[in-house]
């Protein structure tokens, strides 16, 4: 049986603009629990998959409209006898950047249990807008490389705006298996709260601009307070302030090392309020540098009264530090951090050195390389996460030695090759549409190919 023999590309045609999130629901019934159950899934730009209310996976291998890939996700552990529910949220950015080449919106999936298709996307799949995510032009870009950030309103969860059966849309059915391994989405990374206090807004603008300009009044923290915390860490306005009252409480968490992952929040507030979350790699400003020359390394979360647990599956962060600005006079923080996203690799080769310092440099270099490997090589884990020929050439050379595998570099080379333009130059990044290109980077691609064959 071929891939997607019974499935159709679906969408909700009322939501075809920029920066939209659409939910899809389907059901299937099994007499008994299968020994194996998998989902084959593809979309434009990324998806989050849930089975029977449990998170199963999120991703989308970087591809092109005429070179589509699908993921195969094992959901056996989520399946039960009787009726099973499949829930998918798809994020469609609808505008190209350095890490995404815009295609037509669409989702396709098949559920295969013990070798047979038991559920497939079709005109009977239910579709509706995910209203918790703000859609449209009002959400700021993180960077021109990464694309658009997000504003999420937890008070709007459960809305089913525009609910109807899905529309069938035209996209290619020549969909290939993901050329690289699925990422491991790990449990929450341990962190430590290293600073807290109150903040005073001094500027308007995006969440990142407001965080960067805010005045901070620090409260004493003894060392680092571990996160996650079962009992929670109390944040509150203490004492009185002359003049302007604080706008809320803040906290800074340290993940202990450079990391890549998906944002996870767990906090409790007495009333609805905004929570700004900024991230960065250093604290040179005595805070996270959330706003850098028009770039916005912060997102907005609207918390409902009470306990809030939030997982953000569509934007991978590169960071060491997280900063929260909570627009309330008190808050209990149980966790802020990430679920690391890790590309599975063998243990690095042992270097022929015995000196401790040089061995440490080698270990850090191997970890840095892995932090720049997800769907393809990335020039950096934080600001761009983009595939360039010149950058990836050096990464490939290091990877051949350190990890001894060629599957990942081959996939990146194929993505680059598919970006060939009408003027016989390559796009600056792949897959992407960028206003400029660098001719010498196109020339370097030939060197990469030769080195791939040589190694």
Please report, for each region that a protein language model flagged, where it lies by residue:
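Extracellular/oxidizing-compartment recognition motifs
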Residues: 1-382, 391, 407-412, 416, ...
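Aromatic- and histidine-enriched alpha-helix N-cap/loop-to-helix transition segments
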Residues: 44, 387-391, 404, 436-447
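Functionally critical mobile loop/hinge segments
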Residues: 387, 399, 413
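Well-ordered alpha-helical scaffold segments within catalytic/enzyme domains
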Residues: 394-405, 445-455
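The substrate-binding groove and active-site-proximal loops of carbohydrate-active enzymes
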Residues: 432-437, 453-455
């Amino acid at each position: 049986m071929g891939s997607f023999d019974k499935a159709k590309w679906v969408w909700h045609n009322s939501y075809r603009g920029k920066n939209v999130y659409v939910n899809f629901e389907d059901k299937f019934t099994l007499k008994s629990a299968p020994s194996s159950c998998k989902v084959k899934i593809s979309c434009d730009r990324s998806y989050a998959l849930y089975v029977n209310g449990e998170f199963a996976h999120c991703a989308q291998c970087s591809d092109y409209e005429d070179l589509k890939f699908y993921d195969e996700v094992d959901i056996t552990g989520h399946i039960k006898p009787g009726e099973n529910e499949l829930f998918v949220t798809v994020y469609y950015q609808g505008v190209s950047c350095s890490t995404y080449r815009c295609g037509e919106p669409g989702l396709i999936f098949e559920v295969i249990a013990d070798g047979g298709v038991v559920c497939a996307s079709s005109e009977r799949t239910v579709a509706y807008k995910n209203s918790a995510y703000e859609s449209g032009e009002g959400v700021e870009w993180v960077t021109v490389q990464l694309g658009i950030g997000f504003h999420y309103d937890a008070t709007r969860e459960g809305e089913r705006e525009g609910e109807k059966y899905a529309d069938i849309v035209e996209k290619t059915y020549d969909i290939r298996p993901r050329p690289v391994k699925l990422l491991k989405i790990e449990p929450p990374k341990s962190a430590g709260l290293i600073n807290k206090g109150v903040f005073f807004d001094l500027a308007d603008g995006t969440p990142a601009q407001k965080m960067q300009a805010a005045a901070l009044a620090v409260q004493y923290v003894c060392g680092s307070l571990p996160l996650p915390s079962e009992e929670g860490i109390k944040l509150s306005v203490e004492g009185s302030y002359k003049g302007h009252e604080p706008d809320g409480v803040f906290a800074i968490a340290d993940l202990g090392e450079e990391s890549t992952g998906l944002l996870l929040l767990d906090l409790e507030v007495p009333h609805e309020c905004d929570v700004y979350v900024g991230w960065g790699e250093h604290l040179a400003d005595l805070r996270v540098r959330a706003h850098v020359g028009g770039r916005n390394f912060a997102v907005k979360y609207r918390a409902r009264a009470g306990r809030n647990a939030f997982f953000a599956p569509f934007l991978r962060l590169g960071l060491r530090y997280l900063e929260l600005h909570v627009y309330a006079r008190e808050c209990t923080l149980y966790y802020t951090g990430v679920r690391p996203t890790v590309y599975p690799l063998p243990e690095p080769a042992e270097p022929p050195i015995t000196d401790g310092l040089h061995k440490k440099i080698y270990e850090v270099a191997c970890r840095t390389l892995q932090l720049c490997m997800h769907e393809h090589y990335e020039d950096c884990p934080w600001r761009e996460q983009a595939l360039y020929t010149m950058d990836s050439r050096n990464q490939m050379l290091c990877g051949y030695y350190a990890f001894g595998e060629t599957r990942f570099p081959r996939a990146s080379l194929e993505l680059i090759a598919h970006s060939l333009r009408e003027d016989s130059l390559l796009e600056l990044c792949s897959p992407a549409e960028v206003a400029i290109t660098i001719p010498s980077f196109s020339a370097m691609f030939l060197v990469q190919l030769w080195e791939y064959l040589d190694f």
